[in-house]
């Protein structure tokens, strides 16, 4: 279990200094946690006893107070080890703060970080605004606080606290609700006196709610938290990964050879230490220690931090070690995480290809919609701004229905080797191919579940197998993933599970009934359908299993996971993969948020770091994943934008999944291919600043055009706007640069002079860089040995 701090002030008896390492034991191995009482500022009630009892979001919707049965006034975060007052008050009165610019005094001290529990009260809307830290010297620091939705449907966001129900105004709902932990770095050399919350008071746009706030005090170098995961070491699935969080409040730096980190416990031994070569005052890193445990057991662990001559120890009582098989229980599935290869890969190619490429219509800006939704929009004109219904009538006439497009989905020029070679040339590390979209047409062998696939209609080829085989043969470094639609719009076997996304004529939905020709009213065929008893048991889950076991997908990229059999599928797949030594991952859209490894924002990016892994997808088309013939060449994403988005997302712990929509014949729009190749030249030259990097704890960016990434050996400054040759560039963020470090322009082998001043770190951009480079310019700070 996690050490719980029940006093407002509780401090550790010993710390580890980078400059003077001594052999000591710190009870609990934790920093000091100050849990800030918020009672005076509470102005909203989030937890109700019955539908309509509490008004969390202005619509008399709320969390369910019964879901708090296991909480006794304190929550300890497994991710950070931080303790919070939660719930914040007696639950018959206010229990959270709607941010209205409140100024909250805190006990004056030199804090390392400020931690929040937050949520957005707007369904599926991520809110971000600035919180202001006020210091005793009358200076301030503004930093972003981002709140993800308290609940969402289909595209879900996994919270740090997950509750099974939601109260609507008049009824209960069994979609999960969430609260999220946010960590913000504070300059530990300054005395913090107050925290000023942002002002977010518009219920239409959504409001940020704060449920708890805690402050961390660190003295010197401290192991702040350990987290035994169920992740396994690549190449040896008997080895468990333990995540160690180490923070340095200074004043000394971790320099030179740095420190090694290992872990000892009864029945547990370290087989691979972690290394930290550089850690500046105010900085924090999460590193992995690989261990082998004799069995699953709760034991007291000692973490040792070692320099070349001295050691310091930190003790963590009653932590569970050992690898376990997954079960269908949600508390088991939530332990699964994205593997290291995915976290380090950063960049993948998404491919949407199916019969929807035949009409290939989504109109153009500002009337564009997803072209792969053509069938849906022709039957739901109230939801459509693209004029799909009118386009279909004037182009194909009233008697052509969607399944008639199968014969024109020819793949006549489809060359899987050309595809995977393009993915490699683009610099991508993985790809995700749409195995089946919402139209129910699959491009793989669906066996007995349906005949509605590319082996029987259209290309008469196993498209997925051909692409996967080409990748294995010609580009074996590419990881292989599959998009899979959980429901099918017009499959009548889905009828008993049919749903709408919300009430009203403009709702998107999966009715599970046969479509009717929107021009003639006649019932449309569902070509290839075979008799089954249950959609989930006989089609959905078996198709996922085919992808998992026959095609050996490494990424199960679900979409629209409402009704599902995911718990059984996940537990079996996770266990099978572990037994075979395969590192696989699954996204947040399979219907069970607890089992998700990474979030999936769509056509947007986060504006600050998310410590929980995420991947943003969007098309090279302005607003379509499938091929859209209405898009002019000039509107497709260019190489500069590809690089800028990849750099931005990488700096914030995200991956970039960039989509292309091939034509019905299998060719890729030429302007897309050109941009991918051009971006790939830059990506491959600057690979060390992108792949295998991590985010920086203190800041992801400075201003609009500067981003940061790091490895254990170097720190990278990425400029999305070209610096002026012969002039100084000043970075105000507290960069981890020290005397003796070598700064170079990456790929140019040009050394850059630097100096430290009151305003920050100044770099003299070399005159010889005039006219050199494109898209993004990178400085590398190589750490001195």
Regions found by a protein language model. Give the residues of each.
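Poly-acidic low-complexity segments
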Residues: 2-4, 27-55, 67, 181, ...
């Amino acid at each position: 279990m996690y050490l719980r701090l029940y006093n407002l002030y509780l401090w550790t008896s010993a710390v580890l200094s980078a400059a003077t390492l001594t052999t000591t034991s710190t009870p609990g191995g934790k920093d000091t946690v100050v849990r800030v009482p918020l009672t005076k500022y509470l102005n909203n009630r989030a937890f109700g006893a019955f539908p309509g009892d509490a008004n969390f979001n202005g619509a008399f919707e709320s969390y369910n107070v019964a879901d708090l049965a296991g909480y006794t006034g304190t929550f300890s975060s497994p991710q950070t080890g931080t303790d919070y007052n939660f719930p914040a008050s007696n639950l018959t009165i206010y229990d959270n703060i709607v941010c209205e610019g409140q100024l909250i005094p805190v006990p004056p001290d030199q804090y390392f970080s400020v931690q929040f529990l937050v949520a957005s009260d707007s369904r599926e809307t991520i809110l971000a605004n600035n919180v202001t830290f006020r210091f005793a010297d009358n200076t301030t620091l503004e930093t972003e606080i981002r709140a993800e939705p308290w609940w969402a449907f289909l595209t879900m966001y996994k919270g740090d606290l997950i509750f099974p129900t939601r109260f609507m105004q008049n009824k209960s709902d069994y979609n999960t609700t969430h609260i999220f932990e946010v960590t913000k770095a504070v300059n530990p050399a300054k005395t913090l006196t107050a925290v000023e919350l942002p002002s977010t008071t518009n219920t239409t746009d959504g409001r940020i709610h704060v449920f708890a706030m805690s402050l961390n005090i660190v003295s010197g170098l401290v192991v702040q938290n350990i987290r035994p995961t169920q992740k396994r070491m690549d190449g040896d699935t008997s080895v468990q990964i333990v995540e160690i969080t180490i923070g340095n409040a200074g004043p000394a730096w971790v320099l030179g050879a740095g420190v090694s980190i290992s872990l000892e416990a009864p029945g547990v031994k370290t087989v691979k230490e972690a290394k930290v070569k550089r850690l500046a005052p105010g900085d924090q890193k999460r590193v992995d220690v690989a261990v082998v445990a004799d069995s699953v057991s709760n034991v007291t662990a000692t973490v040792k931090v070692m320099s070349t001559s001295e050691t310091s120890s930190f003790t963590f009582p009653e932590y569970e070690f050992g690898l376990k098989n997954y079960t269908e229980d949600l508390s088991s599935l939530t332990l699964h995480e994205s593997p290291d290869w995915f976290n380090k890969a950063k960049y993948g190619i998404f491919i949407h290809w199916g019969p929807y490429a035949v009409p290939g219509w989504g109109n153009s800006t500002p009337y564009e919609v997803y072209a792969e939704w053509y069938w849906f929009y022709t039957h739901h004109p109230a939801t459509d701004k693209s004029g799909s219904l009118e386009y279909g009538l004037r182009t194909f006439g009233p008697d052509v229905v969607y399944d008639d497009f199968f014969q024109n989905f020819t793949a006549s020029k489809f060359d899987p080797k050309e595809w995977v070679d393009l993915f490699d040339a683009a610099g991508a590390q993985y790809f995700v191919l749409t195995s089946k979209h919402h139209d129910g047409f699959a491009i793989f062998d669906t066996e007995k579940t349906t005949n509605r696939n590319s082996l029987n209609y259209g290309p008469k080829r196993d498209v997925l197998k051909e692409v996967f085989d080409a990748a294995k043969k010609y580009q074996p470094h590419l990881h292989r993933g599959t998009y899979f639609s959980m429901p099918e719009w017009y499959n009548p076997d889905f009828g008993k599970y049919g749903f709408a996304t919300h009430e009203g004529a403009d709702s998107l939905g999966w009715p599970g009934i046969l479509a009717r020709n929107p021009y003639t009213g006649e019932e449309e065929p569902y070509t290839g359908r075979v008799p089954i008893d249950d959609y989930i048991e006989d089609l959905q889950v078996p198709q996922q299993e085919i992808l998992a076991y026959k095609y050996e997908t490494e990424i199960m990229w679900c979409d629209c996971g409402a009704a599902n059999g995911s718990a059984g599928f996940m537990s079996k797949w996770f266990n099978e993969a572990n037994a075979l030594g395969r590192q696989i991952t699954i996204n947040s859209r399979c219907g069970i948020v607890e089992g998700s490894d990474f979030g999936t924002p769509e056509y947007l990016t986060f504006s600050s770091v998310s410590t929980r892994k995420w991947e943003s997808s969007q098309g090279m088309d302005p607003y379509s994943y499938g091929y859209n013939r209405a898009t002019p060449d000039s509107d497709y994403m260019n190489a500069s934008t590809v690089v800028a988005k990849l750099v931005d997302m990488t700096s914030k712990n995200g991956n970039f999944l960039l989509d292309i929509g091939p034509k019905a014949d299998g060719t890729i729009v030429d302007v897309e291919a050109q941009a991918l190749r051009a971006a790939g030249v830059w990506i491959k030259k600057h690979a060390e600043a992108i792949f295998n990097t991590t985010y920086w704890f203190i800041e992801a960016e400075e201003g609009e055009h500067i981003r940061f990434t790091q490895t254990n050996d170097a720190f990278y400054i990425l400029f999305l706007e070209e610096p002026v040759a012969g002039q100084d560039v000043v970075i105000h963020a507290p960069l981890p640069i020290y005397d003796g470090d070598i700064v170079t322009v990456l790929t140019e082998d040009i050394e850059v002079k630097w100096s430290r001043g009151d305003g920050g770190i100044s770099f003299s951009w070399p005159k010889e860089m005039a006219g050199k480079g494109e898209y993004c310019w990178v400085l590398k700070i190589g750490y001195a040995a």
